[in-house]
Amino acid sequence: MRHLISMRDIGREEILNILNESEKMEAILNENGHCDFLNGRILATLFYEPSTRTRLSFETAMKRLGGNVIGFTDISNTSVTKGESLADTIKVISGYSDLIAIRHPSEGAARLSSENSKVPVINAGDGSNQHPTQTLLDLYTIKREVGHIENLKIAFIGDLKYGRTVHSLCQALSLFKSVEIKLIAPDELKMPREVIEDIDGKLKLSEMTDVEIDDVDVVYMTRIQKERFVDVNEYYKVKGIYRLSKEHIGNKNVVIMHPLPRVDEIDSEVDNIPQARYFKQSFYGVPVRMAILKLLFEDSIK
């Protein structure tokens, strides 16, 4: 694995390898809190869009591996404001670092970065396209909290049009056997047809607008993303259309996930019930990103 840009680029065995490595990293965190696998190495974090969990978990992961971090979170302090192209920025920064993690508002920016980099590039989110490290931590959460990925029933609820985490996760789940997916969204925010066509026939798929979750293993809630709407009036038409409360949760074994940040789609009272795993899901971002950084670096020096 030279870069991690899209879930389409990696197969089932590579996914399982990353998940197995993540278990080792979690054990290290629980035992010692750190190791020296990437001692003296540098990760560049280039965040052209706001981020809390993804950026900080990448930085934490690199430091837990013994490495260091450089980067930016505010493009107004960079040469982007002078008109420097993304390709040129990557060519320069790949000379300063051993790995790059980039978040960018434009679809395809991570792919372009990988084509201009001397070092491995990790897509930390490119517009509404892909978010592969989130997908891998989601799969890890499912494996750890449900106990299995195959023979899985999962309901995705909310913004399935702009939600890059959902696009990536559906594509990854299509590689596993006997997966059933419910896509629950208003007409304005349905899953893009190209994603449906990509996964159709590989798993059991149903689309609906009403919330039906009593028979699923996982409920995956998503935020309605105001920043993705060209017309803000369209956002207000669907804002708050789905709100998960304790009354909706009749299945004591269901696992409730959310990529975060949350706005109003999950009542805060849900946080205190055992089915809520979204904060644990967020924690899993550290061992999973540790595994990704370690494996990518090892592959880059072979």
From Swiss-Prot:
L-aspartate binds at residues 82, 164, 223. Its EC number is 2.1.3.2. It catalyses: carbamoyl phosphate + L-aspartate = N-carbamoyl-L-aspartate + phosphate + H(+). Pathway: Pyrimidine metabolism; UMP biosynthesis via de novo pathway; (S)-dihydroorotate from bicarbonate: step 2/3. Pfam families: OTCace, OTCace_N. Carbamoyl phosphate binds at residues 53-54, 103, 131, 134, 260-261. The keyword Ribosomal protein does not apply. InterPro entries: Asp/Orn_carbamoyltranf_P-bd (IPR006132), Asp/Orn_carbamoylTrfase (IPR006130), Asp/Orn_carbamoylTrfase_sf (IPR036901), Asp_carbamoyltransf (IPR002082), Asp_carbamoyltransf_Asp/Orn-bd (IPR006131). NCBIfam families: asp_carb_tr, PRK00856.1. Catalyzes the condensation of carbamoyl phosphate and aspartate to form carbamoyl aspartate and inorganic phosphate, the committed step in the de novo pyrimidine nucleotide biosynthesis pathway. HAMAP family: Asp_carb_tr. This is Aspartate carbamoyltransferase catalytic subunit. The gene is pyrB.
